[in-house]
Amino acid sequence: MARGKAKEEGSWKKFIWNSEKKEFLGRTGGSWFKILLFYVIFYGCLAGIFIGTIQVMLLTISEFKPTYQDRVAPPGLTQIPQIQKTEIAFRPNDPKSYMTYVDNIDNFLKKYRDSAQKDDMIFEDCGNVPSELKDRGEFNNEQGERKVCRFKLEWLGNCSGINDETYGYKEGKPCVIIKLNRVLGFKPKPPKNESLETYPVMKYNPYVLPVQCTGKRDEDKEKVGSIEYFGLGGYPGFPLQYYPYYGKLLQPKYLQPLLAVQFTNLTMDTEIRIECKAYGENIGYSEKDRFQGRFDVKIEVKS
């Protein structure tokens, strides 16, 4: 039995290294070299085919604009202050209750201050009244970076933070800043004038994508009170000259046009649900995405 075990152990060692035939694991050095060379060439060819395929694919893709955008959803509508539960609740006589909202608006508006828009190589004045879409050429690097339209804080009126650093929260008249999310190459199409007849107090301009805020439910509409809008030229919406957006590579300092909404007479001690919607021929809404073209926020001013 001991001899059989020794014989088995010897054959195992011989398989690993056969000193007579100079074989390692049953193969000579030349055999190992040939098989390793085969696999190096084989996997090298596979890698070359893969890299070549990727390179060909990359040649068809622009780094400045997606090749296909037919399934890109319309832009979403967002409010500032940005809050997790879309609820704004505060007491006008308690600064601690609303300073989070004020700081949030402050931080967002920093890039809209005059001091941040001084460079004439980057920014340009696009007028104080709404105008047509601003075509800045093809989506490529032939013309270098594109200029960006300035947006003045003073256009936001009572909600600019210039005269009231609390944006109305100290007086129980909260401001909400509204922006349309960036979508590369998106060109807003304002609705026809006749299509807005069902929406009261909507100031029409063919070069403005209008926005309106109302109570979400019937009981909310009675409690919202008066609403003031502050935007470029006094229009409640987004002027077209700020579009289209050319992306971070061509417009790294791009500023979205803003609309400020101030609720000046909210019913106290009542949670009011408010919905704001943008209106346009290419603005859509989705039940699955409550921020697509609209948003709703709950506001409660406590005594």
UniProtKB/Swiss-Prot annotation:
GO terms for molecular function: ATPase activator activity; ATPase binding; P-type sodium:potassium-exchanging transporter activity; protein kinase binding; protein-macromolecule adaptor activity; transporter activator activity. Keywords: Cell adhesion, Cell membrane, Disulfide bond, Glutathionylation, Glycoprotein, Immunity, Innate immunity, Ion transport, Membrane, Phosphoprotein, Potassium, Potassium transport, Signal-anchor, Sodium, Sodium transport, Sodium/potassium transport, Transmembrane, Transmembrane helix, Transport. Glycans are attached at N158, N193, N265. The modification Phosphoserine is found at S11. InterPro entries: Na/K_ATPase_sub_beta, Na/K_ATPase_sub_beta_sf. Residues 63-303 are extracellular. Residues 191-303 are annotated as: immunoglobulin-like. It is a single-pass type II membrane protein. The keyword Electron transport does not apply. Glutathionylated. N-glycosylated. Residues 1-34 are cytoplasmic. It is found in: Cell membrane; Apical cell membrane; Cell membrane, Sarcolemma. The chain crosses the membrane at residues 35-62. The keyword Phosphoprotein applies. The modification Phosphotyrosine is found at Y101. Pfam families: Na_K-ATPase. The sodium/potassium-transporting ATPase is composed of a catalytic alpha subunit, an auxiliary non-catalytic beta subunit and an additional regulatory subunit. Interacts with catalytic subunit ATP12A. Interacts with regulatory subunit FXYD1. Interacts with regulatory subunit FXYD3. Interacts with NKAIN1, NKAIN2 and NKAIN4. Interacts with MLC1. Part of a complex containing MLC1, TRPV4, AQP4 and HEPACAM. Interacts with KIRREL3. Interacts with OBSCN (via protein kinase domain 1). Interacts with TRAF3 and TRAF6. Belongs to the X(+)/potassium ATPases subunit beta family. PANTHER family: SODIUM/POTASSIUM-DEPENDENT ATPASE BETA SUBUNIT, SODIUM_POTASSIUM-TRANSPORTING ATPASE SUBUNIT BETA-1. NCBIfam families: Na_K_ATPase_bet. The C-terminal lobe folds into an immunoglobulin-like domain and mediates cell adhesion properties. This is Sodium/potassium-transporting ATPase subunit beta-1. It comes from Ovis aries. The gene is ATP1B1.
